[in-house]
Each structure stands twice: as C-alpha cells, then as structure tokens.
Amino acid sequence: MYIAKYWGDFIGGSDDSLSLVEFLEGLDKEEITLKEIFTGIGLDRQNMDFRQTVGNLRFINSIGLEIDFHYAIDIVTDLAAILLECRITGHLNLRELYNNEDTQNRCIQVIATEKEYTAIKDALEDFVKNPKSYDLYEMIGDDIIEMAEIVKELRKELLQYEL
C-alpha cells in the first residue's frame, strides 16, 4: 500500500478513521464518488470549510448503529490519503488499512471530480497554513504542528497527480 508512509498516527489513526473505513465497507460497491462520501456522512454541510466541525457528521452502519465523526479535518486528511492511493495504484484494499480480519478484503476506488479534487487540496493547504485554527487542535494540542507537516507532504504528492 503506497500510503502506508502516511497512514498511521495522524492520518488513518483516529476513531474517525475507523469510522470512515466502516462507512466505506458499508457502501458495498467498488467505485465510490467523493460526493457520495461527503453526502453520506454529512461533510457536504461543511461547505468545504473544515476548521470547525458542524454537528451531526454521522452514518448508520450495517447493524443499525449510529456512528459519529468528531473532527471533519480528520476525515478530509484520511480521504486525501485514500485519493492518493487510488491515483497511484488505481484502487485501495480496505483490509490493508488496518490488516484486520474483520475488515473485508475488498478493493475500492474513490473517484473525485476536478472541482472536488481541487477543494480537497485547498482544504489541506489551509490546514497546513493554519493548523491551530482547527477544532482538532483542542484535542491534540501542539502535535497538530507535526500533523500539519505530514499533511504538507501528502498534499505535495497529491499535486503531482492532477486530474
């Protein structure tokens, strides 16, 4: 998995990351649009501003439980890494994200329009420039500076793979 160098503590390492993988599994399809993801969990209500998380970012899982997301920027950074993986390898195996036997051994491809792709890169740039302006800062404190450096590298790679 190409994004293994990013997927860990700050990107892919949160409760929101686990919830995102569960959401993607629940879609039970190979090709998933970014719009489906945004609409499915409520990120579309953020209007591409992820500094402060708008309430009610959630979905209902396959057994009927309501799963909440806490920090919009966590989801966006995870999705950026997933987009990068899909750009480089053409797909993402959900099981590789956590090497968990409970996770389906299934490949997906997340598709973004040029406008969505640009919006994600812009959101990452804003995070890199203003990490302490994000609600996640309240949770992780100054570690957000280290996260911003990782996101900076991720964004740089995304720029190499323009639509």
Regions inferred by a protein language model and the residue ranges of each:
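Residue-level signature of the C-terminal ends
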Residues: 26, 30, 44, 86-89, ...
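Structural motif
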Residues: 61-75
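Amphipathic protein-protein interaction modules
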Residues: 71-135
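Non-catalytic all-alpha helical scaffold/repeat segments
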Residues: 1, 36, 40-46, 51-61, ...
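N-terminal leader/targeting peptides and immediately adjacent processing regions
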Residues: 1-49
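Amphipathic alpha-helical elements of HEAT/ARM-like alpha-solenoid repeat scaffolds that form extended
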Residues: 15-24, 76, 80-83, 148-155
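Low-complexity intrinsically disordered segments
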Residues: 117-163
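Hydrophobic core segments within long, regular secondary-structure runs in both alpha-
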Residues: 31-38, 42, 80, 111-125, ...
